[in-house]
Curated annotation (Swiss-Prot):
Lineage: Viruses, Riboviria, Orthornavirae, Duplornaviricota, Resentoviricetes
Main localization of the protein described in the UniProt heading: host cell
Species this protein is from: Rotavirus A (strain RVA/Pig/Mexico/YM/1983/G11P9[7])
Function per UniProt: Plays an essential role in the viral genome replication. Participates, together with NSP2, in the formation of viral factories (viroplasms), which are large inclusions in the host cytoplasm where replication intermediates are assembled and viral RNA replication takes place. Orchestrates the recruitment of viroplasmic proteins such as capsid proteins to these factories. Participates in the selective exclusion of host proteins from stress granules (SG) and P bodies (PB). Also participates in the sequestration of these remodeled organelles in viral factories.
Top-level taxon: Viruses
Homodimerization and interaction with NSP6: annotated span: 188-197
Biased composition (Low complexity): 17-30
Cofactor note: Magnesium is required for ATPase activity.
Record's GO cellular component terms: host cell cytoplasm
Modified residues (Phosphoserine): S67, S153, S155, S163, S165
Protein name, as recorded: Non-structural protein 5
Stretches for region Disordered: 17-37, 53-72, 129-166
Assembly with partners or alone: Homodimer. Interacts with VP1. Interacts with VP2. Interacts with NSP2; this interaction leads to up-regulation of NSP5 hyperphosphorylation and formation of virus factories. Interacts with NSP6. Participates in the selective exclusion of host proteins from stress granules (SG) and P bodies (PB). Also participates in the sequestration of these remodeled organelles in viral factories.
Amino acid sequence: MSLSIDVTSLPSISSSIFKNESSSTTSTLSGKSIGRSEQYISPDAEAFNKYMLSKSPEDIGPSDSASNDPLTSFSIRSNAVKTNADAGVSMDSSTQSRPSSNVGCDQVDFSLTKGINVSANLDSCISISTDHKKEKSKKDKSRKHYPRIEADSDSEDYVLDDSDSDDGKCKNCKYKKKYFALRMRMKQVAMQLIEDL
């Protein structure tokens, strides 16, 4: 797993990553030991250009400036003037060269030594228990206990009162006895169903 971070806007971080311990007075470039005063500190821009043109393209590394922009060369020389050679601060003696593939973009690769193990085992148990059939059979059994209603035909005419009828609609009921028996049985069935539920 690698993490790439753009540190172009952070020059202090990028310079500290590629900087190693260096010599206090000299800088090693292409096998030659050149003093810092001879390399960078030059009051004349032509001397700096001559120095860059005198080097072969193979010897020019990331620590050198191959730009012909006067502002770039001036900033390099001004930073070099501020650098004290006797203090042991060297900006170009790093044994670890900067990556030249990504121009203008410093990349830092962080390699994680510890692997991240993600356990994605989902132990899920779904148990669905339905008692629908049992309830059905129970209802069937309870219904079997109910006695059947057998109606006897009556030839007599029965007249219901208004209290027994629905809004007085049933004035002449021929089967009053059968009606009362049916109503009683329905009440018993309803009460039995309520108790079962």
